[in-house]
Amino acid sequence: MKVIAINGSPRKKWNTATLLEHALKGAESAGAETKLVHLYDLDYKGCISCFACKLKGGKSFGKCAVNDDLAPLLEEIRTVDALILGSPIYFGDVTGEMRSFMERLFFQFPIYEPDAAVRQPKKVRTAWVYTMNVTEELARQMGYDRMFRDNAGLLERFFGSCESLMCYDTLQFDDYSKYAARRFDPVAKRKRHEEAFPEDCKRA
């Protein structure tokens, strides 16, 4: 069994990456081969609308034709048994790097033909891992649930199944006194990080 986790956060050792690492450790304990990819290490763009993936008889039909740092990863994803996408929430959505990755990952599959089935390598178990500074209640008030549903729907459409883990009210800094962030209670943030975040790691 092969599992790849995609870190859409610019931070390699913070909330999102930590949750992904725990998810991979769980997979490893079951005998899986695992890999963690940091998107911010790669040089790539989102979909460039070349439509080479839909060109009849084209050498890239059904696959993204762009040759950059993302190309080998997109090819490797075709071989996995499970795929985990992780991202912090910035302004109500996943990071720009994750969004660009999603465009490249998903758009290679559908074709514009009547009654055409979505092409995909095989059925793959997938999951989303989200981290965010807001509380669960505030996330609902701000309409995050729709974004969660839409993103899960994309993975279900193209890969077959999806689970989601939401980690709320995360710790942003080690030392809040160094930043212009007085609206937050650093003691409460630290307390939640020490008490709730380990439980989120177990759920991952």
Which stretches of residues belong to each language-model region?
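Membrane-targeting and insertion segments and their boundary/processing signals
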Residues: 71-75, 129, 174-178
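Short aromatic-enriched loop/helix-cap "lid" or pocket-rim segments at secondary-structure transitions
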Residues: 47-50, 139-141, 174-179
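N-terminal beta1-alpha1-beta2 submodule of the flavodoxin-like/Rossmannoid cofactor-binding fold
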Residues: 1-110, 114, 183-204
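Short, catalytically relevant binding-site loops at active-site mouths
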Residues: 90-92, 134-135, 171
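Cofactor-binding loop segments of dinucleotide-utilizing enzymes, especially the Rossmann-like FAD-
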Residues: 8, 39, 129-131, 167
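Short, solvent-exposed amphipathic alpha-helices that sit
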Residues: 15-27, 143-157, 179
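Short, glycine-/small-residue-rich phosphate/pyrophosphate-handling segment
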Residues: 96-97, 109-164
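Glycine-rich phosphate/pyrophosphate-binding loop and the adjoining helix
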Residues: 149-204
